[in-house]
């Protein structure tokens, strides 16, 4: 099994990569180190393929990393409220354009399985806990809105391009 993990040098991503390697997957990690650290992958760095890349800036080499991949785990993105208010374009580029680029590369490589790291922040301040997925969407900050838009892209690509996408 071959898996590609975006944001694989982050906390959640590096733990996922470690588990995938233990399960025998060949793993490609794409990360730009905006929040992750290569040191998070030290214990398995010889067992993975790592590419420093910004998913919001797609170039002609980008698609080659998706060749023969079975699963894409899209964990890359910016996550913080105050900086998203101060620089919403940076968050839009990372969380929306980056997700679009990942989906398009998956489509081009005929990858049918993608897992997307969503955010409960799209519900805003919940009216009740636990918050149901059927709750009203009410993003309060640019970060929450960009994660919601990314999730909508993932859902739409699943319907239109017959992909098996999961948003967590």
Language-model region placement:
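N-terminal Rossmann-like NAD(P)+-binding domain of SDR-like oxidoreductases, especially those catalyzing
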Residues: 1-168
